[in-house]
Structures are given as C-alpha cells and as structure tokens.
Regions:
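Extended amphipathic alpha-helical scaffold segments
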Residues: 150, 155-316
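Extended hydrophobic
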Residues: 1-153, 163-168
Length: 316
C-alpha cells in the first residue's frame, strides 16, 4: 500500500476520526479499504464501509458465490433485514430467521442473489458473529449503516425511522444516511427546523437572560474582588432563571463537592429541560453538515447558523 509507518499513522488517524473500535478485524478491514485507494481519505464512515464491502465482494476468492452477489446487493438485502430488526427491536437472530425474511423479499424484488452465500460472506468477515446460539452484528454501527441504505430505498421506512424512532436524535443514523450520497436535503431541512424549534424551547424553559456573560470580568490575573463579582453575577442569573430549585441549591452551596451524589439531579435537569435532546441534535446536524457536500449553499449556511445558535444555547 505504502511505506509501513505511513500506513500505520493513517490507520491510527482513521480509527480515531471514524470512531471505529480498535480491533484486529477492523484494522484488517480498513487496510483492505486502503487497497482501493490509499490517497483518497474518506471523510465519513459510509464511504469506509462501502469500500470494505466492495473489496470483500470483489475478492477473487469469493467469485464462486455468483456474479450477482456484490456490495450493492448486500446493502439492498441486508438493509431490508435490518429494517425488520429495528421494527421488532431485535439485536440477535437465527440463520433460519434471516432466510425467512430475506428470501421472500428477494423473490418479490426479482433479485437472484443467494442469501445463504450472502450470510456466509458476512460471517466469514465477522460483520455478523455468533453469540449464545444466535447471530448478531458484531458492532451496532453495521445495523445503522444498512438501515440508512434501506431508508434511501424505502420512503415508508424512512418516515418510520424519522417519525416513530425519532432518528434525527440518533447521530449515527443521520451520519450514515447523509454520508451515502451527500445529497440529503430533506434531512438537512428537517434538522434546520428542529434545531431552531428546540433551541427556542430550551431557552424558554431555562429562562436565563440573553445578555448573561460570566466571563466579561475575567482576566489572566484574576484578583479576588473581580472573582467574587463574576461568581456573584453568575449566581444571580441562575437564581432569576427557571431552572429547578435543586439546581439552584447546588449552585448556592459554596462548599459543593463534585463527588457527592448530585449526578441524578443533573441528569434529571438535562432530561427535563431538553438539554440532552439538543446535544444529540447538534451532533446529528454537525455530522450531516460535514457529509452534505452536494446540497444547496444556502442550506449549508442555514444549518451552520442554527448549529451555532444551538451550541450557544447549550453553553448558556
């Protein structure tokens, strides 16, 4: 592929940037993807997984599986099966279950792929592994990747994922969906709208004033007087806000010890004031913006503006 240290450095960077588990099989699959084009560094995991599947099915040792079995057919068939898993809230399955779901689907779609061979390829490459007498995807991101492909193929399933499963708040699904072709303006428009709505909702619930700036008086050489002014300003703004009394009590406690059991209170606060939802929506939107290379410039600009607005609200 290239000089040894260069390949190792590239492998390490990709594992970190793509948030993929550092396991031998993942390292091997990335190295296989490098064979496709080492100079082309993918910016999203959708491209990585597509490269991996393409090399797996283009492997000369796999040709006996038949000419119709390739990464496109794999995504088409396994995407449908992952729809079944998500609708049933299942993580594991049997071989018979896989055949029972996929064979009628292939017949209906006039797809001649051999699903027995397909499953064997997935098992041979440890995309699907055995556990307690059943099968499951080795890593959950494979389910989300194939589900994203299915969302492209089925408007009905896409509507189900976005409405019933609230997939806008699942960054991995949005990342894979937008990363498949870089043209998902429909999702980007939804993210723009939801970011604006949720940011305003969080702002209204928390009730902190727009002009709060606890850092205004902070300097590199902070004296005790200015420090006290800054702390008092922050505490006063919190007292006048709409956050819960429990949070106000914690802030008011001068001897607060971070190891004391206030974690549940903070978690309840994040839930009650939609902070967690906003955090996940920011993640989804950021990944969508990164992956959406071919949407209209005005949509990119508006999404970036709303991400910044939501981030400001989160930091408040």
């Amino acid at each position: 592929i290239a000089e040894e240290n260069r390949v190792l450095e590239r492998l390490d960077v990709d594992l970190i940037d793509l948030n993929i588990h550092r396991t031998p099989i993942n390292c091997i699959q990335l190295l296989i993807a490098f064979l496709n084009d080492f100079e082309d560094r993918p910016i999203n995991r959708s491209k990585v997984f597509k490269y991996v599947l393409k090399v797996i099915f283009d492997n000369p040792g796999s040709l006996f599986y038949g000419d119709t079995l390739d990464e496109e057919n794999c995504g088409f068939i396994v995407g449908y099966f992952c729809e079944y898993l998500l609708r049933k809230n299942k993580e594991s399955f049997t071989e018979d279950e896989f055949y029972k779901i996929t064979r009628p689907f292939c017949e209906k779609e006039y797809n001649p792929s051999n699903v027995s061979d397909l499953l064997q390829v997935l098992k041979n490459n440890q995309i699907v592994v055995g556990l307690n007498g059943e099968l499951r995807f080795r890593f959950s991101y494979w389910i989300y990747y194939f589900a994203a492909i299915r969302m492209k193929d089925s408007e009905e399933f896409k509507a189900y994922m976005l409405n019933d499963k609230h997939s806008l708040y699942f960054p991995e699904i949005i990342e894979f969906y937008t990363g498949l072709d870089g043209r998902s303006e429909d999702i980007v428009k939804m993210l723009i709208n939801d970011l604006s709505t949720l940011s305003n909702k969080v702002h209204s619930k928390i009730g902190l004033s727009d002009d709060i700036n606890p850092f205004k008086e902070i300097k590199w050489s902070l004296n005790e007087t200015v420090k006290g002014m800054t702390q008092n300003q922050l505490e006063q703004n919190i007292k006048q806000s709409k956050v819960s009394d429990e949070i106000k009590d914690i802030v008011a406690d001068k001897n607060y010890n971070s190891i004391k059991p206030y974690t549940q209170t903070i978690n309840n606060y994040l839930e009650e004031y939609d902070i967690k939802n906003l955090m996940e929506l920011i993640k989804s939107s950021s990944r969508a913006l990164r992956n959406s290379e071919f949407i209209k410039p005005e949509h990119k600009e508006e999404l970036l503006k709303n991400i910044a607005m939501a981030w400001k609200e989160l930091m408040r």
